[in-house]
A protein has these predicted regions:
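Positively charged, low-complexity, intrinsically disordered RNA-binding extensions
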Residues: 93-150
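Hydrophobic-cavity lipid-handling domains and compact docking modules
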Residues: 1-87
Length: 150
């Protein structure tokens, strides 16, 4: 039983139906009687939700980073930005670099719990959309996956 992975949706955890597309993973670390204690394992967006974001004649901008939170937890953060239409590759690179810089500063100044709370409350999403707008307006941004690195 120890080490088993449990997946739950954000709706089951928070009763927030606007986050229907977000799945949480937990790993069982300890069992006492009928109670199981878990540790956070990561998040993931549903493929259906991501494929609805990325349509024809838009640009998908993916970022992948290995970062360390302020409570010394190593996580891999995968972001997805979507532009409203096709853009030059130089603009894509600038957007990607800006997203990476912002995610790095957000993760390194917050604990894992604060980072996940920011994902659920859309604070991270709105701040990145606001900052990247100076380069090129994004249609949408989402942290599509987070993983705990052992």
């Amino acid at each position: 039983m120890i080490g088993k992975r449990i997946n739950l949706t954000a709706v089951e955890l928070t009763n927030n139906f606007s986050k229907y597309y977000l799945k949480f993973a937990f790993r069982i670390t300890k069992v006492e009687g009928k109670s199981a204690f878990t540790d956070f394992g990561g998040t993931e967006c549903l493929r259906d939700y991501l494929s609805r974001m990325v349509l024809r004649r838009v640009r998908r901008i993916d970022t992948v980073q290995d970062l360390v939170t302020s409570d010394k937890r190593k996580i891999r953060v995968k972001g997805l930005g979507v532009t409203g239409r096709r853009v030059k590759s130089s603009i894509q690179v600038k957007i990607s670099n800006k997203i990476k810089d912002m995610l790095k500063s957000i993760v390194e100044t917050s604990t894992l719990e604060e980072f996940v709370d920011g994902m659920i409350s859309d604070e991270i999403k709105s701040s990145i959309l606001r900052e990247v707008r100076s380069i090129y307006p994004l249609r949408n941004f989402e942290v599509r996956k987070t993983e705990i690195i052992p």
